[in-house]
């Protein structure tokens, strides 16, 4: 009987570990105060508030920066302090600081990094207890001075175009900013097209839409505030432009 109970516990643990990183981060006790960070060159540094939402326990919060490929770095951006204690239902704060070689980043386009925070729970006094350190990872965009002024009325994402070839579409980003596409569907607020996965489109690049579509897709992008906004398109032949009026109305 004890073997069966042990097996059941191991199965439950395995299932929990197989949950996606996104699902786990949603359960984290220590979370940042936003879903993305914008670091303007003129700011020199930015502050991030970390909240411990656990009603009873204090946590350690470990923070760091990764480059676009997921490598942990301490330059051209670093986090201070890298580790701190945050008491129950209290806030902590970290500073993302630019280092001297930040001047080597491109001045004509955004650069993308990742801000990470891992919660470390206090050691449990209960025997045979599995503790999991959950981690939250959000995008951090470094924006050079020439690109700091952005218009919410005429967002750069409205400059995205599509090129059609049968059921295949290519997404073109002619701007110096990153474009994050979180959804592609046949209609506004529709279910994602089968097989679609979110796109991170680098500045001035073109990527294929990773699904086939019978009709012109409605894309959803993520803006600076983490809001999801629609992109409706009008096509002339195989070239499709954003319908700005309809996209603004949502």
UniProtKB/Swiss-Prot annotation:
GO BP term, example: cell wall organization
InterPro entries referenced in this protein's UniProt entry, alphabetically: Ig-like_fold, PapD-like_sf, Periplasmic_pilus_chap, Pili_assmbl_chap_C_dom_sf, Pili_assmbl_chaperone_bac, Pili_assmbl_chaperone_C, Pili_assmbl_chaperone_CS, Pili_assmbl_chaperone_N
Stored SUPFAM superfamilies: PapD-like, Periplasmic chaperone C-domain
UniProt keyword terms in alphabetical order: Chaperone, Fimbrium biogenesis, Immunoglobulin domain, Periplasm, Signal
Signal peptide segment: 1-28
Disruption phenotype: Deletion of the operon under classical laboratory conditions does not result in any major effect on E.coli capacity to form biofilms compared with the wild-type strain.
Subcellular location: Periplasm
Main location: periplasm
Transmembrane segments: none
GO cellular component term of the entry, any: outer membrane-bounded periplasmic space
Induction trigger: Expression is negatively regulated by H-NS and subjected to cAMP receptor protein (CRP)-mediated catabolite repression.
GO MF, one annotated term: protein folding chaperone
Origin superkingdom: Bacteria
Extra information: The operon is cryptic under classical laboratory conditions, but is functional when constitutively expressed.
Role this protein plays: Part of the yfcOPQRSUV fimbrial operon. Could contribute to adhesion to various surfaces in specific environmental niches. Increases adhesion to eukaryotic T24 bladder epithelial cells in the absence of fim genes.
PANTHER family associated with the record: FIMBRIAL CHAPERONE YFCS-RELATED, PILUS ASSEMBLY CHAPERONE
Annotated family: Belongs to the periplasmic pilus chaperone family.
Record's protein name: Probable fimbrial chaperone YfcS
Gene: yfcS
């Amino acid at each position: 009987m004890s073997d069966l109970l042990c097996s059941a516990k191991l199965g439950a643990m395995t299932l929990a570990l197989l949950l996606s990183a996104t699902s786990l981060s949603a359960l984290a006790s220590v979370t940042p105060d936003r879903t993305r960070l914008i670091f303007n060159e003129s700011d020199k540094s930015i502050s991030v508030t970390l909240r411990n939402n656990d009603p009873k326990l204090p946590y350690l919060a470990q923070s760091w920066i990764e480059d676009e490929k997921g490598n942990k770095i301490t330059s051209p951006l670093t986090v201070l302090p890298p580790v701190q204690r945050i008491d129950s239902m209290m806030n902590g704060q970290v500073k993302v600081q630019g280092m001297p070689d930040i001047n080597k980043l491109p001045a004509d386009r955004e650069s993308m990094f990742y801000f990470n925070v891992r919660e470390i729970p206090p050691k449990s006094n209960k025997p045979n207890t599995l503790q999991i350190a959950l981690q939250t990872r959000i995008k951090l965009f470094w924006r050079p001075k020439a690109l700091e002024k952005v218009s919410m009325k005429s967002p750069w994402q409205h400059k995205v175009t599509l090129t059609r070839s049968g059921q295949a579409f290519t997404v073109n980003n002619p701007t110096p900013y990153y474009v994050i596409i979180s959804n592609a569907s046949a209609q506004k607020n529709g279910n994602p097209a089968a097989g679609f996965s979110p796109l991170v489109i680098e500045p001035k690049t073109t990527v294929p839409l990773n699904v086939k579509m019978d009709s012109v897709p409605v894309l959803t992008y993520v803006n600076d505030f983490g809001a999801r906004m629609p992109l409706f398109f009008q096509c002339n032949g195989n070239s499709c432009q954003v319908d700005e009026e309809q996209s603004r109305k949502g």
